[in-house]
Design a protein with these regions (language model features):
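Charged, low-complexity interaction regions
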Residues: 28-34, 109-117
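Conserved aromatic-histidine-acidic binding/catalytic patches
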Residues: 43, 86-94, 112, 119
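Short acidic, glycine/Ser/Thr-rich loop/turn "cap" segments at secondary-structure junctions
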Residues: 80-88, 104-114
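Preference for long, well-ordered alpha-helical segments
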Residues: 112-147
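Conserved short "hinge" loops at termini or chain/domain junctions
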Residues: 1-87, 133, 138-140, 147-159
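Elongated alpha-helical scaffolds
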Residues: 92-106
């Protein structure tokens, strides 16, 4: 299964996410993440090495190869054929992880206020967890456990 992550798609997610984040912070009258317009104009300067590092670390168990093209990265994951239908949501999760990783790096580099760093960090972790769970779900069907035998039927709290 090939997962293609295009930088332009990731930047689009970053732009929209930052706009939403700033609106929420503005409503709460809290400091915002500034300088995003300049950031999106100069996204070529972003050090993508860290972004790919986060992604590949999350995927290393399933990744068979990685190739960096012009403005994109292609991950080849070893997944059974029956999961190819789930490729689109998985691809979107990768883009979200990339976007929120960039936002984390950008916020840290530009000494964003603590409240902004916290929100970004939480959101980045949500997507990273989602990615790990998505990949783990591809491993195999869940192991069926035998139902536990009830030892003392009188002690069951029947509601």
């Amino acid at each position: 299964m090939n997962i293609v992550i295009k930088k332009e798609d990731v930047i689009d997610i970053v732009s929209r996410s930052v706009a939403i984040l700033n609106r929420q912070l503005q409503q709460q009258q809290q400091p915002q993440l500034l300088g995003i317009d300049e950031f999106t104009r100069h996204f070529a300067e972003i050090d993508w090495t860290n972004v790919w590092s986060v992604i590949t670390t999350a995927s290393e168990r399933y990744m068979t190869s990685l190739s960096e093209g012009e403005g994109s990265i292609t991950l080849t994951l070893s997944m059974p054929p029956r999961y190819t239908l789930e490729q689109a949501p998985l691809q979107q999760t990768y883009k979200n992880v990339s976007a929120w990783t960039i936002m984390s790096l950008y916020a840290e580099k530009n000494a964003a206020p603590a409240n902004v760093l916290q929100v970004i960090s939480q959101q980045a972790n949500v997507y990273l967890t989602l990615l790990r769970e998505s990949l783990a779900g591809h491993r195999s069907a869940p192991i069926r456990k035998e139902p536990q035998k009830v030892r003392n039927i009188d002690k069951i709290n029947w509601l």
